[in-house]
A protein has these predicted regions:
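Non-catalytic alpha/beta scaffold blocks inside enzyme catalytic domains
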Residues: 1-189
């Protein structure tokens, strides 16, 4: 039940353990050319990562990068002259296609926030986001709905997980965080 058989499986090491996909290992995979793309929401790895030069080199090896932010930061602009100079490259050396999506900032969206001190807190938005900026869950929902429509129209590799996903939210293009929290925690069905 619950579609668990449709979930992708983590690759296993020679010892049979799941491979590590935490921050440092993920960027190491990018650096080796083992990843094609990255969605970066609420993170600026070029500025905040433990090894900025390696992060810039790793991002340069991706086919695509999607950055959802309320302003252009170093990760979204990693291909520019001033940042590429860190790794002795020029923008011409970078084949990564970068997509910048306008996202709401912390004061423009409801949600939970976690920090490195392991605090978690809930907050409500103070103001609506300007222009085309959207909260993260709306950006993700719109990408999912477009991909599902594309799979339905054109088919593709492994369409079952996308086609079978139950997207029951009252507003499918902008799911309520309350509804998402209920889904994560579970609720009585009878």
């Amino acid at each position: 039940g619950f579609g668990y058989d449709l979930h992708p499986r983590l690759p296993q090491s020679a010892e049979g353990a799941d491979e590590n996909w935490s921050w440092a290992y993920m960027f190491d995979r990018m650096y080796r050319g083992d990843m094609e793309g990255l969605f970066a929401f609420g993170m600026n790895p070029v500025s905040n990562g433990p090894h900025s030069k390696k992060v810039v080199s790793a991002l340069s090896k991706l086919k695509w990068l999607v950055v959802a932010e309320n302003f252009e930061q170093e990760t979204a602009a990693f291909w520019r002259d001033d940042i590429q100079a860190l790794v002795d490259q020029t923008p011409a050396d970078v084949a990564t296609e970068v997509f910048m999506l306008p996202a709401a900032n912390f004061a423009e969206k409801d949600g939970a926030f976690v920090n490195s001190a392991r605090w978690i807190q809930w907050k409500w938005k103070a103001v609506d986001p300007p222009g085309e900026a959207r909260p993260d869950q709306e950006i993700i929902a719109r990408i999912f709905l477009a991909v599902r429509e594309l799979y339905a129209r054109e088919g593709g590799v492994h369409p079952a997980p996308v086609a079978a996903l139950d997207w029951w939210y009252s507003n499918p293009a902008s799911p309520s965080l309350d509804e998402a929290a209920k889904e994560i925690n579970g609720w009585a069905t009878e």
